[in-house]
Amino acid sequence: YIMLFKWNYKPPTKEEKQAADELGAKLNISPILAQLLMQRGITTESAAKRFFHPQLADLINPFLMKDMDLAVDRLNDAMGRKERILVYGDYDVDGCTAVALVYKFIQQFYSNIEYYIPDRYDEGYGVSKKGIDYAKEAGVKLIIILDCGIKAVEEVAYAKSLGIDFIICDHHMPDEELPPAVAVLNPKRADDSYPFKHLCGCGVGFKFMQAFAKNNGIPFARLIPLLDLCAVSIAADIVPVVDENRILAFHGLKALNQNPSIGLKAIIDICGLGGRDITMSDIVFKIGPRINASGRMESGRESVDLLVERDFSHALSKAKHIDCYNEQRKDIDKQMTEEANNIVSRLESQRHQSSIVLYDENWKKGVIGIVASRLTEIYFRPTVVLTRDGDFATGSARSVTGFDVYSAIKSCRDMLVNFGGHTYAAGLTLRWDDIQKFRKRFQKYVDEHIQPEQTEAMLNIDAEIDFRDITKKMHSDLKRFAPFGPCNTKPLFCTTGVYDYGTSKVVGREQEHIKLELVDSKSSNVVNGIAFGQSASARYIKSKRSFDIAYTIEDNIFKRNMVQLQIEDIRPAEEDE
């Protein structure tokens, strides 16, 4: 079931070209790159300077966030009264990094503090009664909850009845009613005028610590060692890498590369990233999944134990343990994705639906989110994957670009026990017997609201260029666009009418990739490229006919100072069709 990509490219107008020429001249970068800046809404010299040199001094004043003053006052009171504090968080990467960040920072000034990660299988998502009862037993008076809690109205009220206060730091969509916490920090609150809405949970935790430090005269420099955790959470939680997130991610990657905290250093070593320049995609594909794996397979607590560890040899053995979980997770994940694919291909009816809803009572709760993501990547449909939990079905929804899956799920709220999340990813719980009813309603909502182009495999091309445009300077300037992520994706270029230099060949264990050496008609430069999983195009390439390619420009790991094109799609040249 191969989706053919549609290429979406809008050439710049004459006016846009002229503006790009002028901006490029001012910044001493090529007009092509100036054009990319303008597509990202950066049109002035000063905006470009802020983009290329993100400054920690430009972080937003944390006290602009609603309830921040209340949160800082309550934390100060707890310390003054020597109350026991519990830092509580979700079991995913964002939750674990957030808990590690807040715990590590407060612990430098105050010792009566511990952390708690609920068990995905036993307690489920968010605030659990079990967690609150544990806090009561342990004599906790204040719970700081991170990356969840925005809907925990009953649980927070229950804690309050036991004399336990809550500070909520969350970034999921709030309902009309907020929990009765001392402070609810969430930039997505309808009544919050905080200028940046896309922080992740760890980001909200960082803002809380920034405010606490500011209020207590603690120098900002003490917060810098926490930025590596922010970068990991921003990449792994797939939030827009713009504005404040760009500043945090930029300086967080710097910390991750120059002096990572001990726990992260152990993970970097285990992933084989030591000595490499770590990027956002290394976090997404290597570091993040390992931190996630302990929460998916066993308990997220082990990840936090690792992230706050101070002794490197202990950290290394914990990282090895978590790596084993990740291997188990990969096996289960692969098996479940194959099963899900088989179901989709058997259910011809779902082939033509604009969404997919699948369920199986034997699927592992910790991995269904990944399976839902895989299915959206394969079929380009909003997808819900459910598994059984007693009389209930719990599951994950993932979306395609531009479609709000949270609203689709919200439209079924009368048959849901629970739901929460974001535009592109959400979680839900319903009665097992209601699955068919849910599927009908969900699919009807998607049918009525989705745009046809949202279910097509689209490649959004940033610029059309010739090989002679790819100079050393252009490549080094291009790297300054990083860190990449949603809303600042790695620029995708296309070049038309290229030819095989005669030396391209199929490679890989199963001969599935093509290693290319290419030329175009404008210059004699031979350019190296790799096309993963595209060996089906090899016959055409070797037929001496011309073709068009869409690609990103990468470092060539084997030849220093050389570039390599990572080719996303190959298609016969227009005139040959």
Where on the chain are the PLM-derived regions?
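Short, glycine-/Ser/Thr-/acidic-enriched flexible segments
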Residues: D92, G149-K151, M173, R189-A190, ...
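Short alpha-helices
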Residues: L101, P179-I218, L223-A235
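Conserved beta-strand segments of alpha/beta enzyme cores
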Residues: N112-E114, D165, A183, N528
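Conserved acidic residues
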Residues: K141, V182, D548
